[in-house]
Structure formats: C-alpha cells, structure tokens
Amino acid sequence: MLNHVYGLIGVVGTIITIATSFIRNQDISQWLLVCSGWLAALLIGWFTHRTIKAISNNHTNVIKSNMEVINSHNESNQNLMAENKELIKELARTSEQKEKMESIAAYLATQNPQINAMPRTASRPENIDSEAN
C-alpha cells in the first residue's frame, strides 16, 4: 500500500511542478511547491502511521490469541499432572496389595507343608499329531 501512496504523491508532485512552470508569478509558484512538499510529507507520515497502527493491532490480536492457547495448554497440563499423580498413587496401592497377597500366600504355604501340589497334565502327543494333519 505504501508503494501506491508514494506513487500517488509522486504523480501529484509532478503535476504541481508542471503547473507551477506555467505560472508567471514567482511567489505563487514557490508557495505551491512548498505546500506540495509539506502535503507530500504529511500524507506519507499519515499513511505510515496508519500502517504501523494496523500492524501493531494485528500483533496485539495474535499475542492475545497465543496467550489464550498457552493458558488452555497450561490447564490441560495441570489436569494431566493431577491424573498422573492419581495413577501413581493407585499403582503404589496396587503394588502394596500385591506384596501383602504374596506374603499371605507364603505364610499359608508354610503352614501346611503336607499338601502336595498337583502337577499339570502333560499334553498328549496324539493331540499334537492330529492338529498337525
């Protein structure tokens, strides 16, 4: 957009310069040229200020949206950390229960040593052969 502004100001300045070359009164010609220069400077300054303000507003909006995303992620992280702590506590309780059950099983095994465990039945070879065919 600034290129269009510079182009427009350049064309207007050229037209004013050509117009002042036809004016015979030297004071009016100089006054028009000075006014043309100041007008060009004011227009460039105004358009530059407007462009910078638009860019700043855009960056402000981007920063606000990024902060919203960051806050959302922080909340998600907090929730996940709380869930992780709960799972760690549950795992610790489960491990403790497992150890208690193992100690109870070991105690019961020492109380009655006369009971023999039943061996597992061996698989029949004929079942294996019939499955292979």
Curated annotation (Swiss-Prot):
This protein kills E.coli when the beta protein is absent. This is Protein gop. It comes from Enterobacteria phage P4. The lineage of its organism: Viruses, Duplodnaviria, Heunggongvirae, Uroviricota, Caudoviricetes.
